[in-house]
C-alpha cells in the first residue's frame, strides 16, 4: 500500500513539474502582446536589469489604435510589464507580464501552478488569447471589444501614479526583505 501511495505521489509531482517546467506552457503565437517578449525569456534578462526603473510610454500605431505601457524593474526581485492597445471603438488587447528574479526551480513550478489556477478561475470572465508560464515569468493577453473609452483611459492613466508608488517603495526599502531572501542562495 505504501509503495502504491509513493508511486502515485511521485507521478503527480512529476506531472506538476512537467506541466510548468521552464520551457512549457499554454498559448499560441506571440503576435498580440508587447512585441518585446520571447516565450522563453520575457521582457527582462533572467535576473533582471541592474538598476531600478519604472517607465511609462505611449503612442499611436499605424492603424490609428492607441497604446500605453508601464515597465518596472526592481533589481534582484521582480519585473512587470502591462500594455493596453485599443482603438476608438474600445476594441483591443491587454498584455500583462510578471517576471521574478533569482527564483529556484521549486518557486518557478509553484508560480506556474498558481498562475494556471488563476487562469482557470478567471477564464469565464476574460477572453485570454495567449498565455505562458515558464523560466521565472508569466504573461497573458486578453482581447476585448466595445469597452467604454473612459474605462480604458482610466486604466492607463494610473500608470504614472503606479510608477511613483513603485519608486517610493524602492526608496523606502519595502522590497529589501524579498531581495535578501532571493539573493542569499
Please annotate each region the language model reported.
Residues 1-4:
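Positively charged n-region of N-terminal signal peptides that target proteins for export
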Residues 6-12:
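Sec-dependent N-terminal signal peptides
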Residues 21-23:
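Bacterial signal peptide processing site
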Residues 16-19:
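C-terminal motif of bacterial Sec signal peptides marking the signal peptidase cleavage site
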Residues 25-43:
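N-terminal, intrinsically disordered, polar/charged segments of Gram-positive cell-envelope systems
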Residues 44-185:
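Subset-of-secretome marker
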Amino acid at each position: 500500500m505504501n509503495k502504491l501511495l509513493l508511486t502515485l505521489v511521485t507521478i503527480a509531482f512529476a506531472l506538476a513539474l512537467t506541466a510548468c517546467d521552464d520551457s512549457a506552457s499554454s498559448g499560441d503565437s506571440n503576435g498580440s502582446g508587447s512585441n518585446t517578449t520571447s516565450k522563453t525569456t520575457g521582457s527582462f534578462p533572467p535576473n533582471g536589469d541592474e538598476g531600478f526603473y519604472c517607465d511609462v510610454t505611449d503612442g499611436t500605431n499605424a492603424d490609428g489604435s492607441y497604446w500605453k505601457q508601464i515597465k518596472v524593474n526592481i533589481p534582484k526581485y521582480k519585473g512587470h510589464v502591462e500594455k493596453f492597445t485599443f482603438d476608438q471603438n474600445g476594441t483591443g488587447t491587454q498584455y500583462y507580464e510578471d517576471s521574478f528574479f533569482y527564483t529556484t526551480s521549486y518557486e518557478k513550478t509553484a508560480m506556474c501552478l498558481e498562475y494556471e489556477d488563476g487562469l482557470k478561475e478567471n477564464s469565464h470572465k476574460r477572453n485570454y488569447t495567449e498565455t505562458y508560464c515558464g523560466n521565472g515569468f508569466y504573461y497573458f493577453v486578453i482581447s476585448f471589444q466595445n469597452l467604454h473609452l473612459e474605462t480604458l483611459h482610466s486604466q492607463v492613466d494610473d500608470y504614472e501614479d503606479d510608477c511613483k508608488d513603485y519608486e517610493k517603495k524602492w526608496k523606502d526599502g519595502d522590497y529589501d526583505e524579498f531581495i535578501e531572501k532571493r539573493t542569499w542562495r
